[in-house]
Curated annotation (Swiss-Prot):
The lineage of its organism: Bacteria, Bacillati, Actinomycetota, Actinomycetes, Mycobacteriales. It comes from Mycobacterium avium. Not known. This protein is one of the major immune reactive proteins in mycobacteria. Pfam families: HSP20. Residues 21-131 form the sHSP domain. This is 18 kDa antigen 1. Belongs to the small heat shock protein (HSP20) family.
Amino acid sequence: MLMRSDPFRELDRLTNQVLGTPTRPAVMPMDAWRVGRRLVVEFDLPGIDAESLDIDIERNVLTVRAERPALDPNREMLATERPRGVFSRELVLGDNLDTDKIEASYRDGVLSLHIPVDEKARPRKIAVGAARHPEPSPKTAREVVNA
């Protein structure tokens, strides 16, 4: 059996107990990928109530906020490893994404955002027409030659 060892975990735990603050910042892990004509972004937010999620877009900056409330201070905690408080993450979106059509869903602790590529930014073919010169009529050709 393999075990992952973190020599600082015990130090972090003791520091948190003594000072009452986490030594590492709360994170909002995410994955992002492109599927066809849309960008998919997923954030891991286990234990977050969907009502506490707040998603804003201003210009091309997408902000995701969530909150995991503090525990009852009267509890005698034996372990506190899950970060609490407000989490926030900002993503700068490219101009090629249609921010008016973002879809969001939250299921099993995962927030999923689907952001379509803007129609104007999609690759498209531009037809090139050949410039055609009118063929001279026999009369016109004789006039040109005689000139």
